[in-house]
Protein backbone atom coordinates (compact mmCIF):
# COMPACT_ATOMS: atom_id res chain seq x y z
CA UNK A 1 0.00 0.00 0.00
CA UNK A 2 1.43 3.33 -1.09
CA UNK A 3 1.15 6.55 0.84
CA UNK A 4 -0.51 9.34 -1.16
CA UNK A 5 -0.08 12.78 0.35
CA UNK A 6 -3.24 14.83 0.42
CA UNK A 7 -2.56 18.15 -1.36
CA UNK A 8 -6.06 19.44 -0.92
CA UNK A 9 -5.45 21.50 2.26
CA UNK A 10 -2.33 22.96 0.73
CA UNK A 11 -4.14 23.81 -2.53
CA UNK A 12 -6.98 25.32 -0.60
CA UNK A 13 -4.58 27.59 1.25
CA UNK A 14 -2.92 28.54 -2.03
CA UNK A 15 -6.24 29.39 -3.63
CA UNK A 16 -7.30 31.44 -0.63
CA UNK A 17 -4.00 33.37 -0.65
CA UNK A 18 -4.29 33.98 -4.39
CA UNK A 19 -7.86 35.17 -4.00
CA UNK A 20 -6.90 37.54 -1.20
CA UNK A 21 -4.03 38.89 -3.30
CA UNK A 22 -6.33 39.53 -6.24
CA UNK A 23 -8.91 41.14 -3.99
CA UNK A 24 -6.27 43.43 -2.48
CA UNK A 25 -5.01 44.30 -5.94
CA UNK A 26 -8.51 45.18 -7.02
CA UNK A 27 -8.84 47.45 -4.01
CA UNK A 28 -5.72 49.45 -4.92
CA UNK A 29 -6.93 52.55 -6.74
CA UNK A 30 -5.08 53.62 -9.85
CA UNK A 31 -3.51 57.09 -9.64
CA UNK A 32 -5.76 60.07 -10.28
CA UNK A 33 -5.00 62.38 -13.18
CA UNK A 34 -3.44 64.90 -10.83
CA UNK A 35 -1.32 62.23 -9.13
CA UNK A 36 -0.21 60.94 -12.52
CA UNK A 37 0.86 64.44 -13.60
CA UNK A 38 2.86 64.92 -10.42
CA UNK A 39 4.45 61.46 -10.64
CA UNK A 40 5.44 62.02 -14.27
CA UNK A 41 6.66 65.51 -13.46
CA UNK A 42 5.08 66.85 -16.66
CA UNK A 43 1.90 68.80 -17.43
CA UNK A 44 0.98 68.33 -21.09
CA UNK A 45 -0.93 71.30 -22.50
CA UNK A 46 -2.28 71.86 -25.99
CA UNK A 47 -2.96 75.34 -27.35
CA UNK A 48 -3.09 77.53 -30.47
CA UNK A 49 -0.13 79.40 -31.91
CA UNK A 50 -1.23 83.04 -31.87
CA UNK A 51 -0.33 86.36 -30.18
CA UNK A 52 -3.18 85.99 -27.68
CA UNK A 53 -2.35 82.44 -26.64
CA UNK A 54 1.18 81.18 -27.23
CA UNK A 55 4.15 81.97 -29.45
CA UNK A 56 7.93 82.18 -29.28
CA UNK A 57 10.05 85.29 -29.68
CA UNK A 58 13.77 85.87 -29.26
CA UNK A 59 13.37 85.67 -25.51
CA UNK A 60 11.60 82.32 -25.61
CA UNK A 61 8.02 81.23 -25.04
CA UNK A 62 5.39 83.85 -24.28
CA UNK A 63 1.67 84.61 -24.53
CA UNK A 64 -1.20 85.18 -22.09
CA UNK A 65 -2.37 81.55 -22.02
CA UNK A 66 1.20 80.30 -21.79
CA UNK A 67 2.05 82.45 -18.78
CA UNK A 68 -1.15 81.54 -16.96
CA UNK A 69 -0.60 77.81 -17.49
CA UNK A 70 3.14 78.05 -16.75
CA UNK A 71 2.36 79.49 -13.33
CA UNK A 72 -0.05 76.62 -12.74
CA UNK A 73 2.63 74.07 -13.66
CA UNK A 74 5.08 75.83 -11.35
CA UNK A 75 2.51 75.61 -8.55
CA UNK A 76 2.29 71.86 -9.15
CA UNK A 77 6.07 71.60 -9.23
CA UNK A 78 6.12 70.02 -12.70
CA UNK A 79 7.50 70.82 -16.13
CA UNK A 80 5.15 72.31 -18.72
CA UNK A 81 5.19 70.55 -22.08
CA UNK A 82 3.41 72.47 -24.83
CA UNK A 83 1.83 71.11 -27.98
CA UNK A 84 0.18 73.27 -30.64
CA UNK A 85 -2.92 72.15 -32.49
CA UNK A 86 -3.30 72.52 -36.24
CA UNK A 87 -6.82 73.84 -35.68
CA UNK A 88 -9.57 73.79 -33.06
CA UNK A 89 -10.98 70.43 -34.11
CA UNK A 90 -7.49 68.98 -33.87
CA UNK A 91 -7.15 70.38 -30.34
CA UNK A 92 -10.17 68.45 -29.09
CA UNK A 93 -9.22 65.35 -31.09
CA UNK A 94 -5.75 65.26 -29.55
CA UNK A 95 -7.15 65.68 -26.04
CA UNK A 96 -9.54 62.78 -26.51
CA UNK A 97 -6.84 60.36 -27.68
CA UNK A 98 -5.42 57.91 -25.11
CA UNK A 99 -2.25 59.43 -23.72
CA UNK A 100 -3.05 62.83 -25.20
CA UNK A 101 -2.62 66.25 -23.56
CA UNK A 102 -4.50 66.55 -20.27
CA UNK A 103 -5.10 70.31 -20.48
CA UNK A 104 -6.34 72.55 -23.27
CA UNK A 105 -5.77 76.31 -23.00
CA UNK A 106 -6.57 78.23 -26.15
CA UNK A 107 -9.09 80.96 -25.40
CA UNK A 108 -11.94 78.47 -25.51
CA UNK A 109 -15.61 79.31 -25.01
CA UNK A 110 -18.00 76.76 -23.52
CA UNK A 111 -20.67 75.76 -26.06
CA UNK A 112 -23.24 72.92 -26.19
CA UNK A 113 -21.17 71.04 -28.78
CA UNK A 114 -17.93 71.43 -26.87
CA UNK A 115 -19.47 70.27 -23.60
CA UNK A 116 -19.68 66.85 -25.27
CA UNK A 117 -15.97 66.98 -26.12
CA UNK A 118 -14.43 68.25 -22.88
CA UNK A 119 -15.08 69.55 -19.40
CA UNK A 120 -14.61 73.23 -18.69
CA UNK A 121 -12.88 75.04 -15.85
CA UNK A 122 -13.86 78.22 -14.09
CA UNK A 123 -13.54 81.32 -16.30
CA UNK A 124 -10.52 83.61 -16.38
CA UNK A 125 -11.20 86.13 -19.17
CA UNK A 126 -14.36 87.78 -20.49
CA UNK A 127 -14.52 88.52 -24.22
CA UNK A 128 -17.12 89.70 -26.70
CA UNK A 129 -17.61 88.20 -30.19
CA UNK A 130 -17.30 90.97 -32.78
CA UNK A 131 -18.13 91.19 -36.47
CA UNK A 132 -15.36 93.05 -38.32
CA UNK A 133 -15.31 94.58 -41.78
CA UNK A 134 -12.99 96.63 -44.01
CA UNK A 135 -12.97 100.39 -43.61
CA UNK A 136 -14.49 102.03 -46.68
CA UNK A 137 -17.02 99.25 -47.20
CA UNK A 138 -20.66 99.36 -46.12
CA UNK A 139 -20.82 98.80 -42.38
CA UNK A 140 -23.16 96.02 -41.21
CA UNK A 141 -25.21 97.02 -38.18
CA UNK A 142 -27.16 93.84 -37.34
CA UNK A 143 -27.25 90.12 -38.20
CA UNK A 144 -29.58 90.73 -41.12
CA UNK A 145 -26.83 92.71 -42.85
CA UNK A 146 -24.62 89.61 -42.94
CA UNK A 147 -26.76 88.07 -45.68
CA UNK A 148 -25.04 88.24 -49.07
CA UNK A 149 -21.56 88.78 -47.60
CA UNK A 150 -18.56 86.50 -47.88
CA UNK A 151 -17.82 85.45 -44.30
CA UNK A 152 -15.02 83.14 -43.17
CA UNK A 153 -14.45 81.94 -39.59
CA UNK A 154 -12.23 79.36 -37.90
CA UNK A 155 -13.46 75.80 -38.38
CA UNK A 156 -14.85 74.33 -35.19
CA UNK A 157 -14.91 77.69 -33.45
CA UNK A 158 -17.60 79.04 -31.15
CA UNK A 159 -18.14 81.68 -33.83
CA UNK A 160 -19.07 78.99 -36.33
CA UNK A 161 -21.68 77.71 -33.88
CA UNK A 162 -23.03 81.25 -33.50
CA UNK A 163 -23.37 81.66 -37.25
CA UNK A 164 -25.07 78.28 -37.56
CA UNK A 165 -27.68 79.44 -35.04
CA UNK A 166 -28.13 82.73 -36.92
CA UNK A 167 -28.58 80.90 -40.20
CA UNK A 168 -31.68 79.22 -38.80
CA UNK A 169 -33.20 82.70 -38.42
CA UNK A 170 -31.66 84.11 -41.62
CA UNK A 171 -31.73 81.34 -44.28
CA UNK A 172 -29.89 83.55 -46.76
CA UNK A 173 -26.84 83.76 -44.50
CA UNK A 174 -23.83 81.89 -45.86
CA UNK A 175 -20.42 81.44 -44.29
CA UNK A 176 -17.30 79.33 -44.65
CA UNK A 177 -15.27 77.53 -42.02
CA UNK A 178 -11.53 77.17 -42.58
CA UNK A 179 -9.10 74.91 -40.75
CA UNK A 180 -6.11 76.33 -42.63
CA UNK A 181 -6.05 79.79 -41.03
CA UNK A 182 -5.68 81.53 -37.68
CA UNK A 183 -7.25 84.77 -36.42
CA UNK A 184 -4.35 86.81 -37.82
CA UNK A 185 -5.02 85.36 -41.28
CA UNK A 186 -8.73 86.17 -41.10
CA UNK A 187 -8.00 89.77 -40.15
CA UNK A 188 -5.51 90.04 -43.00
CA UNK A 189 -8.12 88.72 -45.43
CA UNK A 190 -10.59 91.39 -44.29
CA UNK A 191 -7.90 94.08 -44.35
CA UNK A 192 -6.95 93.21 -47.93
CA UNK A 193 -10.54 92.84 -49.13
CA UNK A 194 -10.27 89.10 -49.82
CA UNK A 195 -13.37 88.50 -47.70
CA UNK A 196 -16.12 90.82 -46.53
CA UNK A 197 -16.40 89.90 -42.87
CA UNK A 198 -15.15 87.67 -40.12
CA UNK A 199 -16.03 87.07 -36.49
CA UNK A 200 -13.36 87.30 -33.76
CA UNK A 201 -13.23 87.72 -30.00
CA UNK A 202 -12.60 91.22 -28.67
CA UNK A 203 -9.30 90.35 -26.98
CA UNK A 204 -7.78 88.91 -30.15
CA UNK A 205 -8.97 91.86 -32.20
CA UNK A 206 -7.53 94.33 -29.69
CA UNK A 207 -4.17 92.57 -29.76
CA UNK A 208 -3.99 92.25 -33.55
CA UNK A 209 -5.86 95.24 -34.94
CA UNK A 210 -2.75 97.39 -34.95
CA UNK A 211 -1.34 95.19 -37.71
CA UNK A 212 -4.39 95.79 -39.88
CA UNK A 213 -5.24 99.51 -40.06
CA UNK A 214 -8.22 98.95 -42.37
CA UNK A 215 -10.08 96.57 -40.04
CA UNK A 216 -13.05 98.00 -38.14
CA UNK A 217 -15.63 96.64 -35.68
CA UNK A 218 -19.10 96.48 -37.25
CA UNK A 219 -21.02 95.37 -34.15
CA UNK A 220 -20.90 93.01 -31.19
CA UNK A 221 -22.61 89.71 -31.92
CA UNK A 222 -24.29 88.78 -28.67
CA UNK A 223 -23.29 89.17 -25.05
CA UNK A 224 -19.85 88.88 -23.52
CA UNK A 225 -18.67 85.31 -22.97
CA UNK A 226 -16.07 83.70 -20.75
CA UNK A 227 -12.93 81.86 -21.77
CA UNK A 228 -12.05 78.67 -19.92
CA UNK A 229 -9.54 75.82 -19.89
CA UNK A 230 -10.62 72.29 -20.73
CA UNK A 231 -9.76 68.76 -19.61
CA UNK A 232 -10.66 65.57 -21.45
CA UNK A 233 -14.10 64.12 -20.57
CA UNK A 234 -12.65 60.72 -19.66
CA UNK A 235 -10.44 62.09 -16.90
CA UNK A 236 -11.43 62.15 -13.24
CA UNK A 237 -12.10 65.41 -11.39
CA UNK A 238 -8.74 65.72 -9.62
CA UNK A 239 -6.97 67.89 -12.21
CA UNK A 240 -10.07 69.98 -12.93
CA UNK A 241 -10.56 70.66 -9.23
CA UNK A 242 -6.92 71.71 -8.91
CA UNK A 243 -7.25 74.00 -11.93
CA UNK A 244 -10.36 75.65 -10.50
CA UNK A 245 -8.66 76.19 -7.15
CA UNK A 246 -5.68 77.75 -8.93
CA UNK A 247 -7.81 80.07 -11.08
CA UNK A 248 -9.76 81.17 -8.03
CA UNK A 249 -6.49 81.86 -6.20
CA UNK A 250 -4.90 83.98 -8.95
CA UNK A 251 -8.16 85.92 -9.29
CA UNK A 252 -8.16 86.75 -5.57
CA UNK A 253 -4.46 87.55 -5.15
CA UNK A 254 -4.28 89.86 -8.18
CA UNK A 255 -2.00 87.68 -10.32
CA UNK A 256 -4.65 87.24 -13.00
CA UNK A 257 -5.34 90.97 -13.20
CA UNK A 258 -1.63 91.70 -13.52
CA UNK A 259 -1.35 89.25 -16.40
CA UNK A 260 -4.36 90.83 -18.08
CA UNK A 261 -2.75 94.23 -17.68
CA UNK A 262 0.53 92.95 -19.05
CA UNK A 263 -1.02 91.57 -22.22
CA UNK A 264 -4.14 93.68 -22.71
CA UNK A 265 -3.75 96.78 -20.54
CA UNK A 266 -2.09 98.80 -23.27
CA UNK A 267 -3.46 97.40 -26.52
CA UNK A 268 -6.18 100.00 -27.04
CA UNK A 269 -3.89 103.05 -27.14
CA UNK A 270 -3.54 103.00 -30.93
CA UNK A 271 -5.69 104.62 -33.55
CA UNK A 272 -5.82 104.35 -37.32
CA UNK A 273 -3.58 107.35 -37.96
CA UNK A 274 -1.01 106.21 -35.43
CA UNK A 275 -1.04 102.68 -36.81
CA UNK A 276 -0.61 103.86 -40.39
CA UNK A 277 2.20 106.25 -39.41
CA UNK A 278 4.13 103.71 -37.37
CA UNK A 279 3.80 101.22 -40.21
CA UNK A 280 5.52 103.62 -42.59
CA UNK A 281 8.22 104.61 -40.12
CA UNK A 282 8.94 101.00 -39.26
CA UNK A 283 9.97 100.38 -42.85
CA UNK A 284 11.37 103.76 -43.82
CA UNK A 285 13.11 105.07 -40.69
CA UNK A 286 14.03 102.22 -38.37
CA UNK A 287 16.48 100.47 -40.74
CA UNK A 288 18.77 103.53 -40.57
CA UNK A 289 19.17 103.25 -36.81
CA UNK A 290 18.55 99.60 -36.01
CA UNK A 291 22.24 98.70 -35.71
CA UNK A 292 22.77 101.60 -33.29
CA UNK A 293 19.86 100.35 -31.16
CA UNK A 294 21.24 96.81 -31.18
CA UNK A 295 24.80 97.86 -30.32
CA UNK A 296 23.80 100.19 -27.48
CA UNK A 297 21.21 97.77 -26.12
CA UNK A 298 23.73 94.94 -26.01
CA UNK A 299 26.22 97.12 -24.14
CA UNK A 300 23.65 98.17 -21.53
CA UNK A 301 21.92 94.76 -21.40
CA UNK A 302 18.59 96.10 -22.66
CA UNK A 303 16.33 94.54 -25.30
CA UNK A 304 17.05 96.55 -28.45
CA UNK A 305 13.37 96.52 -29.39
CA UNK A 306 12.47 98.17 -26.09
CA UNK A 307 15.13 100.80 -26.72
CA UNK A 308 13.77 101.34 -30.24
CA UNK A 309 10.26 101.67 -28.81
CA UNK A 310 11.48 104.39 -26.43
CA UNK A 311 13.12 106.16 -29.36
CA UNK A 312 9.92 106.09 -31.37
CA UNK A 313 7.85 107.42 -28.49
CA UNK A 314 10.35 110.23 -27.97
CA UNK A 315 11.00 111.39 -31.54
CA UNK A 316 9.36 109.02 -34.03
CA UNK A 317 12.97 108.09 -34.93
CA UNK A 318 13.88 111.60 -36.03
CA UNK A 319 17.45 112.58 -35.02
CA UNK A 320 17.18 116.35 -35.49
CA UNK A 321 14.05 117.26 -33.53
CA UNK A 322 13.98 119.81 -30.70
CA UNK A 323 11.08 120.36 -28.34
CA UNK A 324 9.94 123.69 -26.93
CA UNK A 325 11.40 122.62 -23.58
CA UNK A 326 14.89 122.17 -25.02
CA UNK A 327 15.16 118.39 -25.18
CA UNK A 328 16.76 117.30 -28.45
CA UNK A 329 17.64 114.38 -30.65
CA UNK A 330 16.33 110.94 -31.42
CA UNK A 331 16.11 110.01 -27.71
CA UNK A 332 15.10 113.56 -26.70
CA UNK A 333 17.76 114.05 -24.02
CA UNK A 334 18.00 117.12 -21.82
CA UNK A 335 21.31 118.98 -21.86
CA UNK A 336 22.13 117.87 -18.32
CA UNK A 337 21.29 114.22 -18.99
CA UNK A 338 23.32 114.26 -22.21
CA UNK A 339 26.36 115.62 -20.38
CA UNK A 340 26.00 113.06 -17.60
CA UNK A 341 25.82 110.26 -20.18
CA UNK A 342 28.84 111.51 -22.14
CA UNK A 343 26.85 112.72 -25.15
CA UNK A 344 28.59 115.64 -26.86
CA UNK A 345 26.16 116.03 -29.77
CA UNK A 346 22.52 115.29 -29.06
CA UNK A 347 21.66 115.51 -32.76
CA UNK A 348 24.00 112.65 -33.60
CA UNK A 349 21.71 109.60 -33.73
CA UNK A 350 24.36 107.13 -32.58
CA UNK A 351 25.34 109.26 -29.58
CA UNK A 352 21.72 109.97 -28.70
CA UNK A 353 20.82 106.28 -28.73
CA UNK A 354 23.90 105.44 -26.65
CA UNK A 355 22.97 108.14 -24.16
CA UNK A 356 19.36 107.01 -23.97
CA UNK A 357 20.34 103.38 -23.44
CA UNK A 358 22.82 104.31 -20.73
CA UNK A 359 20.33 106.57 -19.00
CA UNK A 360 17.53 103.99 -19.06
CA UNK A 361 19.87 101.32 -17.65
CA UNK A 362 20.89 103.75 -14.90
CA UNK A 363 17.29 104.60 -14.02
CA UNK A 364 16.33 100.94 -13.91
CA UNK A 365 19.29 100.11 -11.70
CA UNK A 366 18.23 102.77 -9.18
CA UNK A 367 14.88 101.11 -8.47
CA UNK A 368 14.40 99.16 -5.25
CA UNK A 369 15.58 95.55 -5.38
CA UNK A 370 12.09 94.49 -4.31
CA UNK A 371 10.70 95.43 -7.74
CA UNK A 372 10.78 92.42 -10.06
CA UNK A 373 10.21 92.01 -13.78
CA UNK A 374 8.19 92.88 -15.75
CA UNK A 375 7.11 95.65 -13.37
CA UNK A 376 10.72 96.77 -13.03
CA UNK A 377 10.84 97.68 -16.72
CA UNK A 378 7.49 99.52 -16.71
CA UNK A 379 8.35 101.48 -13.54
CA UNK A 380 11.77 102.30 -14.97
CA UNK A 381 10.07 103.71 -18.07
CA UNK A 382 7.83 105.86 -15.88
CA UNK A 383 10.86 107.10 -13.95
CA UNK A 384 12.68 107.77 -17.24
CA UNK A 385 9.77 109.98 -18.25
CA UNK A 386 8.70 111.78 -15.08
CA UNK A 387 11.72 111.48 -12.80
CA UNK A 388 12.59 109.15 -9.95
CA UNK A 389 11.35 111.55 -7.27
CA UNK A 390 7.84 111.78 -8.67
CA UNK A 391 7.76 108.02 -9.21
CA UNK A 392 8.63 107.50 -5.55
CA UNK A 393 5.82 109.88 -4.58
CA UNK A 394 3.37 107.78 -6.60
CA UNK A 395 4.69 104.57 -5.03
CA UNK A 396 4.17 106.02 -1.56
CA UNK A 397 0.64 107.05 -2.47
CA UNK A 398 0.01 103.49 -3.63
CA UNK A 399 1.34 102.09 -0.38
CA UNK A 400 -0.83 104.48 1.63
CA UNK A 401 -3.86 103.25 -0.31
CA UNK A 402 -3.10 99.64 0.54
CA UNK A 403 -1.81 98.92 -2.96
CA UNK A 404 1.49 97.33 -3.98
CA UNK A 405 4.16 99.98 -4.68
CA UNK A 406 6.21 97.41 -6.60
CA UNK A 407 3.49 96.71 -9.17
CA UNK A 408 2.97 98.92 -12.22
CA UNK A 409 -0.75 98.07 -12.27
CA UNK A 410 -1.13 99.76 -8.87
CA UNK A 411 1.36 102.61 -9.26
CA UNK A 412 -0.11 103.77 -12.57
CA UNK A 413 -3.41 104.40 -10.76
CA UNK A 414 -1.63 106.84 -8.44
CA UNK A 415 0.48 108.76 -10.96
CA UNK A 416 -2.38 110.99 -12.24
CA UNK A 417 -2.98 112.11 -8.65
CA UNK A 418 0.33 113.98 -8.77
CA UNK A 419 -1.48 116.63 -10.83
CA UNK A 420 -4.17 117.13 -8.16
CA UNK A 421 -3.45 119.49 -5.29
CA UNK A 422 -5.35 117.28 -2.88
CA UNK A 423 -2.66 114.67 -3.39
CA UNK A 424 0.53 116.38 -4.53
CA UNK A 425 0.42 118.72 -1.54
CA UNK A 426 1.15 115.66 0.60
CA UNK A 427 4.12 114.47 -1.46
CA UNK A 428 7.80 115.29 -1.21
CA UNK A 429 8.33 116.41 -4.80
CA UNK A 430 4.98 118.10 -5.38
CA UNK A 431 3.12 118.66 -8.62
CA UNK A 432 3.82 116.61 -11.73
CA UNK A 433 1.95 115.82 -14.93
CA UNK A 434 1.32 112.32 -13.68
CA UNK A 435 -0.86 111.28 -16.58
CA UNK A 436 2.05 111.59 -19.01
CA UNK A 437 4.09 108.61 -17.81
CA UNK A 438 0.97 106.43 -17.89
CA UNK A 439 0.53 107.19 -21.61
CA UNK A 440 4.30 107.08 -22.15
CA UNK A 441 4.55 103.55 -20.78
CA UNK A 442 1.40 102.32 -22.55
CA UNK A 443 2.62 103.58 -25.92
CA UNK A 444 6.08 102.09 -25.50
CA UNK A 445 4.66 98.75 -24.45
CA UNK A 446 2.55 98.69 -27.61
CA UNK A 447 5.46 99.66 -29.86
CA UNK A 448 7.57 97.04 -28.13
CA UNK A 449 4.89 94.36 -28.63
CA UNK A 450 4.79 95.12 -32.33
CA UNK A 451 8.57 95.12 -32.73
CA UNK A 452 8.72 91.83 -30.84
CA UNK A 453 6.08 90.26 -33.05
CA UNK A 454 7.49 91.42 -36.39
CA UNK A 455 11.00 90.23 -35.52
CA UNK A 456 10.14 86.91 -33.85
CA UNK A 457 9.87 84.67 -36.95
CA UNK A 458 13.52 85.28 -37.83
CA UNK A 459 15.69 84.65 -34.82
CA UNK A 460 18.99 85.59 -36.41
CA UNK A 461 19.68 88.86 -38.17
CA UNK A 462 17.16 91.59 -38.83
CA UNK A 463 14.08 91.57 -40.98
CA UNK A 464 13.89 95.32 -40.81
CA UNK A 465 17.43 96.11 -41.89
CA UNK A 466 17.41 93.34 -44.52
CA UNK A 467 14.25 94.71 -46.07
CA UNK A 468 12.38 91.48 -45.31
CA UNK A 469 9.98 92.91 -42.78
CA UNK A 470 6.86 90.79 -42.42
CA UNK A 471 4.10 92.13 -40.29
CA UNK A 472 1.48 89.38 -40.17
CA UNK A 473 -0.98 90.13 -42.92
CA UNK A 474 0.13 93.69 -43.56
CA UNK A 475 2.63 93.33 -46.39
CA UNK A 476 0.11 94.39 -49.02
CA UNK A 477 -1.25 97.25 -46.97
CA UNK A 478 0.75 98.74 -44.14
CA UNK A 479 2.78 97.37 -41.21
CA UNK A 480 1.78 97.58 -37.54
CA UNK A 481 1.37 100.78 -35.76
CA UNK A 482 0.69 102.73 -32.65
CA UNK A 483 -0.29 106.36 -32.39
CA UNK A 484 2.08 109.21 -32.78
CA UNK A 485 3.81 109.97 -29.48
CA UNK A 486 1.72 112.03 -27.13
CA UNK A 487 4.71 114.01 -25.96
CA UNK A 488 8.43 114.06 -25.71
CA UNK A 489 10.42 113.64 -22.55
CA UNK A 490 8.90 115.27 -19.55
CA UNK A 491 10.61 118.43 -18.32
CA UNK A 492 10.33 116.78 -14.94
CA UNK A 493 12.94 114.25 -16.02
CA UNK A 494 15.80 114.78 -13.58
CA UNK A 495 19.38 115.34 -14.55
CA UNK A 496 21.92 113.07 -12.94
UniProtKB/Swiss-Prot annotation:
<dbReference type="InterPro" id="IPR023703">
    <property type="entry name" value="MltF"/>
</dbReference>
<keyword id="KW-0732">Signal</keyword>
<dbReference type="InterPro" id="IPR000189">
    <property type="entry name" value="Transglyc_AS"/>
</dbReference>
<feature type="region of interest" description="Disordered">
    <location>
        <begin position="464"/>
        <end position="496"/>
    </location>
</feature>
<feature type="signal peptide">
    <location>
        <begin position="1"/>
        <end position="29"/>
    </location>
</feature>
<comment type="function">
    <text>Murein-degrading enzyme that degrades murein glycan strands and insoluble, high-molecular weight murein sacculi, with the concomitant formation of a 1,6-anhydromuramoyl product. Lytic transglycosylases (LTs) play an integral role in the metabolism of the peptidoglycan (PG) sacculus. Their lytic action creates space within the PG sacculus to allow for its expansion as well as for the insertion of various structures such as secretion systems and flagella.</text>
</comment>
<dbReference type="GO" id="GO:0009279">
    <property type="term" value="C:cell outer membrane"/>
</dbReference>
<dbReference type="GO" id="GO:0016998">
    <property type="term" value="P:cell wall macromolecule catabolic process"/>
</dbReference>
<feature type="region of interest" description="Non-LT domain">
    <location>
        <begin position="30"/>
        <end position="267"/>
    </location>
</feature>
<dbReference type="InterPro" id="IPR001638">
    <property type="entry name" value="Solute-binding_3/MltF_N"/>
</dbReference>
<feature type="region of interest" description="LT domain">
    <location>
        <begin position="268"/>
        <end position="496"/>
    </location>
</feature>
<keyword id="KW-0456">Lyase</keyword>
<dbReference type="InterPro" id="IPR023346">
    <property type="entry name" value="Lysozyme-like_dom_sf"/>
</dbReference>
<protein>
    <recommendedName>
        <fullName>Membrane-bound lytic murein transglycosylase F</fullName>
        <ecNumber>4.2.2.n1</ecNumber>
    </recommendedName>
</protein>
<comment type="similarity">
    <text>In the C-terminal section; belongs to the transglycosylase Slt family.</text>
</comment>
<comment type="similarity">
    <text>In the N-terminal section; belongs to the bacterial solute-binding protein 3 family.</text>
</comment>
<feature type="active site">
    <location>
        <position position="314"/>
    </location>
</feature>
<dbReference type="GO" id="GO:0071555">
    <property type="term" value="P:cell wall organization"/>
</dbReference>
<dbReference type="InterPro" id="IPR008258">
    <property type="entry name" value="Transglycosylase_SLT_dom_1"/>
</dbReference>
<dbReference type="Pfam" id="PF01464">
    <property type="entry name" value="SLT"/>
</dbReference>
<dbReference type="GO" id="GO:0009253">
    <property type="term" value="P:peptidoglycan catabolic process"/>
</dbReference>
<dbReference type="GO" id="GO:0008933">
    <property type="term" value="F:peptidoglycan lytic transglycosylase activity"/>
</dbReference>
<feature type="compositionally biased region" description="Low complexity">
    <location>
        <begin position="486"/>
        <end position="496"/>
    </location>
</feature>
<dbReference type="Pfam" id="PF00497">
    <property type="entry name" value="SBP_bac_3"/>
</dbReference>
<keyword id="KW-0961">Cell wall biogenesis/degradation</keyword>
<keyword id="KW-0472">Membrane</keyword>
<keyword id="KW-0998">Cell outer membrane</keyword>
Amino acid sequence: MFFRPDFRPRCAKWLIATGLFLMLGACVEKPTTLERVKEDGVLRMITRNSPATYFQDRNGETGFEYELVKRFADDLGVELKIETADNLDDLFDQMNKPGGPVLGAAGLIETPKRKQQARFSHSYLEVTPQVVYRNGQSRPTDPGDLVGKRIVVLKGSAHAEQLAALKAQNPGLEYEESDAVEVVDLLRMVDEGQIDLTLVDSNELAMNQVYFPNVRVAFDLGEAREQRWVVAPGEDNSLLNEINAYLDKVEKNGTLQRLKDRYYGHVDVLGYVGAYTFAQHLQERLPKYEKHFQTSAKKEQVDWRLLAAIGYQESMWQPAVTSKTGVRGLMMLTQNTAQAMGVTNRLDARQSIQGGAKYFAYVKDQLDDSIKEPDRTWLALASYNIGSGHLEDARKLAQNEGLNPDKWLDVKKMLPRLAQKKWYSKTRYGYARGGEPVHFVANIRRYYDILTWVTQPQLEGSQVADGNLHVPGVDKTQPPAPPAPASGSSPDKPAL
